[in-house]
Amino acid sequence: MANDLFVKDALFNQASPSQVAPRLLFIPVSGTYGMGEYARSLAIARAASRRWQHAAIHFVLSREAPYATGAPYPATLLPSSPTFHSVAVIELIEKWRPDVVIFDNAGRTAQMRAALRSGARVVYISARRRQRRKAFRWHWMRLIDEHWIAYPEFIAGSLSLSERLKLGLAGRPEVRYLDVILSRVLPGQREAILSRAGCDAGTFVLVVPGGGTGHPGADHAVEQFMSAARALAASGVPTVYVGPVNATSAAGTAKDSGPGAHSIDAATLNWHPLGPVPQADLAELMRSARLIIANGGSTLLQAVACGSACIAVPIAKDQGERTRRCVAAGVAVAAARDSASMVQAADRLLQDETQRVALAGRAARLGLADGVEVALQSLARLLKTARHAAPP
């Protein structure tokens, strides 16, 4: 029956088993805080499962990560980030025999060598300068088939002279910029998403602090974002909040019950907390927002890729430089990590339509690539040259 299915699709007529039912192993750095690497790997995994319906996908995660137990794919859970558990990672690679192993800001030399010995192709994703430097070490360049730089070139920087010389001499790996990981909903779902938000397109401010896992030195960042969102709502601005919502804030959103329900104030009418939402839904909200207040991480670049006017608020150590580059490119304005600064920046843009529209226009003209599609095309090329057929 499986062979009959393959024949029905002309694309797979000459395909090897690994091209039709690839085994993809994702190893993102993971731990008690931050989830950018996991979110990126998950978006690629979901897209891969749609492209290759028979794909086998497996994750390796820290059991301390707040998202670990809710992962939608089979996962091997380790005491901490996979980088620190080479014995377990190597054992999994040797037993499971993936076609491609994707290390996202994680991995050790021994783990990559094990992947090569098993016949797998190796992808390394770097999201920080330190990891990028590691990927350009001579012994890693011989192990990596593709090096994906997680951010756009204007953020991550062009290849240096040294990097270009090394690539010329080594002849590998292939280097690609992922630009932005931006999931998409199915056609026709936009109206349903806006209906759940309770706002029309182009009318609301979207406030997104990020994944909600606390970065060192960023204590109370979520509370500051939420406070800013509530203040904007109280001033009469329709405000959609996507992120962690505590019980106190949720209780303050009640729109009915009680003798005073008929006199709902502006803050309640304009306050639309959604809690966490799927990435694809968030992207649709970004495309529909009048203005976005976001952290300085991947969320900021997603907002820019959606062609939206954006206020960037760095909440982690590595987000400051990213924010500065976006400001320098004229695609975002910056605000400090306190609610008053966020509200002040939002008020200025909401009252200056010319500046807001110009900001959004420059963001749209960047034309950032869809990193998920870049990743899928690269995986398809790697699978064509897989050095072994996936086991049954």
Describe the function of each predicted region.
Residues 62-72, 233-276:
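Catalytic donor nucleotide-activated moiety binding site of glycosyltransferases and closely related
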Residues 300-344:
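Catalytic binding pocket for nucleotide-activated donors in carbohydrate/polymer assembly enzymes
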Residues 27-51, 59-168:
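Active-site and donor-binding regions of nucleotide-sugar-utilizing enzymes
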Residues 287-294:
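Acidic donor-binding loop of glycosyltransferase active sites
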Residues 368-392:
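C-terminal alpha-helical cap of glycosyltransferases
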Residues 355-369:
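A short, well-ordered alpha-helix in the C-terminal region of glycosyltransferases
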Residues 143-211, 244:
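A nucleotide-sugar donor-handling region in carbohydrate enzymes
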Residues 40, 44, 186, 196, ...:
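Conserved catalytic-core segment of nucleotide-activated headgroup transferases in glycan assembly
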